[in-house]
């Protein structure tokens, strides 16, 4: 039984955001039609490493993987681990498939990735408690208006769910370039200090990107085009 509270006003019961943008290019559509069904999550049943990859292995989950650069990089770096990602935006899924496919067939496909085109919360609810080694939430939609604050993924209900699904010693990584969301997220995590230990020892630990944490296209644009500062947070499940 998880600590996830479906009636909590700080709990979102579905992910908000757009589902599709500009039309897909021909190659992207081909990947959606051909590759996505091969590496999609099963429609029913518990989501475990054994069910997805045929053997026990450390399991990583990325919520809203954007263009998939981070997920593909980490999966390629850790071939003995299993990576799952959820993204409701079809164009992001298509971009991720380009990375996973080995840049449209120029390299061998990355075999240890599974994708869900849809709501990350649906996936989390099907993962047995204590199963995840890593959970990533990188640059989620900040929903800056106060009346939309309950739509933020960083709220008490979802964070309780994160804690339930991570194993003891597992790691939750959060990144943002939005100052309002930064303050909101830290307030939320402070309320969950009994579940998570913040791994920062000094300011550099959250102002400098850690090793093995690649810069995504979104992050690069935030820094270079908009001049945003980016913050990186690592929390260990107690």
Swiss-Prot record:
Residues annotated for substrate binding in this entry: 145, 177, 216-219
Residues annotated for S-adenosyl-L-methionine binding in this entry: 62, 87, 119, 141
A GO term, aspect molecular function: tRNA (guanine(46)-N7)-methyltransferase activity
Catalytic activity: guanosine(46) in tRNA + S-adenosyl-L-methionine = N(7)-methylguanosine(46) in tRNA + S-adenosyl-L-homocysteine
PROSITE patterns xref list: SAM_MT_TRMB (PS51625)
Pathway(s) annotated for this protein in UniProt: tRNA modification; N(7)-methylguanine-tRNA biosynthesis
Enzyme active site: 141
Pfam family, one: Methyltransf_4
Annotated keywords: Methyltransferase, S-adenosyl-L-methionine, Transferase, tRNA processing
Transmembrane segments: none
EC nos: 2.1.1.33
InterPro entries: SAM-dependent_MTases_sf, tRNA_(Gua-N-7)_MeTrfase_Trmb, tRNA_methyltr_TrmB_bact
Top EC class, one word: transferase
Function of the molecule: Catalyzes the formation of N(7)-methylguanine at position 46 (m7G46) in tRNA.
Family: Belongs to the class I-like SAM-binding methyltransferase superfamily. TrmB family.
Protein name: tRNA (guanine-N(7)-)-methyltransferase
Gene name of the record: trmB
